[in-house]
């Protein structure tokens, strides 16, 4: 209780832009929670299969990947406020297209545009919070931001699971409508219930624009930062030239020995870890709502509750992860929960029994994700300080790129072979990710110097 009161007091001390940002995120992530539960189910109700869902996910990620660098340039040029406003507008229009359009090409175009908008939000998030806070405020600000995102998502997932039931119970919009309105809504009752629920989610997101317009202009802050980072850009240019020289030297005679040495470097092992994790996660995680509702027979409301419980348990286990680091060490904290989660995942995917899957799903997610923050710290500490920016970019590209590929492949495999194959494949990929991590850092994770 004392910690809660301290965070509430700290919120009042945050800068104006930071407080308004948190309010906007709270409203936005309720909508995110609703969409997380319902959008794939909406596509299934329209008659699409999981292979098309995989294509939608891939196209959205492709749009984001192509926009990451231009988004960073726009943030530096126009500031966080304008980027937040216009990217939210773009996501709003794309989201409306994803809900109202029902043919494949407009849905894919809408997903691509939504990915572009999402890239801007992703790029502006951390720098905006950092620029609009002091060094003392940042730990509290980033923690509160994560908690708000989690709580709002859980609320959205719970609410989103109930909305289709409410509309299907006899709402006026489910009956005969004027021709102009009838054409905008899906003909099938189940698809229309999902569609109306998603439209409700967009209405909930609309007030999130108000705090953005109330923010103070922050372009001057970004210009000062841009001036301050000139030296960093010069260093990056030098690092790039050095890297090119090293690559040329690498393929000189005797490169087999250098190859073995390069594969054993912490950066290589950790990048491979993120790549295998991303590929494995992409195979099945985007389809869990379809798996529970379509394959196991759960209602959307039940899945929303299950996923909400998983997020809550994940948050609680994340809070105690540092305690495990002190007791059993950082490498054991990273590996043991994740390895324990693998058999639980196999039971969920290979034993089609709803009560069992509903009970194991939150535990699996909590074990798999509880040390995610610890992994981020570990991944940074294992490389030299001057290379951490490049390392973080490598990790993100590896994870997000392989996740997109996994999501596309997962949809095809589920459609043509079934669910057990994707769960088994994900288990193999997770083992390929974790075993090299243990092999590389098993001897001494404390005294080993960064490379």
Please place each PLM-identified region on the residue numbering:
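C-terminal membrane-cytosol helix-exit motif in multi-pass small-molecule transporters
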Residues: 168, 202-225, 436-441
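Conserved MFS/SLC helix-loop-helix module at the cytosolic interface between two early adjacent transmembrane helices
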Residues: 66-102
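Structural signature of the two symmetry-related core transmembrane helices
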Residues: 82-97, 332-347, 424-427
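Helix-to-loop junctions at the C-terminal end of transmembrane segments
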Residues: 67-79, 164, 317-330, 414-415
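Hydrophobic core of transmembrane alpha-helices in multi-pass small-molecule transporters
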Residues: 26, 94, 105-121, 275, ...
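Central cavity-lining transmembrane alpha-helices of secondary-active solute carriers
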Residues: 55-73, 308-320
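Juxtamembrane intracellular "pre-TM" segments in multi-pass secondary transporters
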Residues: 1-15, 217-272, 451
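Helix-loop boundary and gating motifs at the non-cytosolic
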Residues: 3-63, 266-308
